Amino acid sequence: MSDNFKYSEWRKNENIKRYEIPNVENYFEDLMNIEHSFSGRMDIPLANTFIMEAVQLVVNSISLFELGYFDNAYYSLREAIEISTTIVYLSDMPDEERGEKMEDWKNTKDFPMQGQMLNQLYQYGIVISDMKEKMESFFDEIKNVSKKINKCIHKQGLRFFYVSRNHPINIKKDDKVFIENYVDFLEKTIGIIAVMRLAIDPYPVLLMDEEILLRCFDSMTEAYKNEFVEKYITNETLKDYKKTEMYINYYNGHITEEKKNYAVFEYQVSFFANTFVQSAFSNWYCCYILWSEKRH
């Protein structure tokens, strides 16, 4: 046996087969729609952290799938759905209850699981109960996607066994359908996160409307792109969302405001961008100085 041979390395890769997702770069770019949809809700300071974590879990899932760890990839998709549901669960309740539930979550005390959170939201949540009534097909989709993802996570079917998929008899079989199935769940998960983000506030969609954009410059939020909505949310789901009380109330609250002209709007955007960059650099530099002082 060669001195360079390491059994451990061979064994770790024996039943692992890498996969290539077509046009994978597009998914990373599309996820920026969610990453840049910052919420300015002061009563839920961790909202953006939860949404960004959900996005990171999708990124992890893509990486894991291409490395060949497909069940872990599906697990990360499920986690992404659960995390986006958790912040909606925490946001769609009275302030006094939110504080108590947030402490339970932080301290890893008893906390409802995905299905329990959704059931409670359907019964007691003001925003989600209304969304479910207006967007029933979307919430059916969450249930179906989660159920099917669990089939892979719980290894139901030999196609989800590493030793079967990568057996010499099967290893040369075409993986096209296997990859397509994963991509389908990937895209549906991105869509679910994008819509759950809209249960916090409707600005990613409101600001798609120029009539609102020029009346309400929300420095925290970037609007979803039309292409992103068409691919992941669908125009039909968006149409249903615009029937919700939250969307209508926000829309009516802004449409009566004075409409800015483009020159004023572009100045505000430019001013905020420069201020944001300067503030971010200042915060980074202060952290660096503190870190340097502690280090030395």
Predicted features along the sequence, with ranges:
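A cross-kingdom marker of C-terminal helix-rich interaction/assembly modules
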Residues: 1-70, 75, 96-296
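Short, charge-rich amphipathic alpha-helical segments embedded
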Residues: 76, 82-98
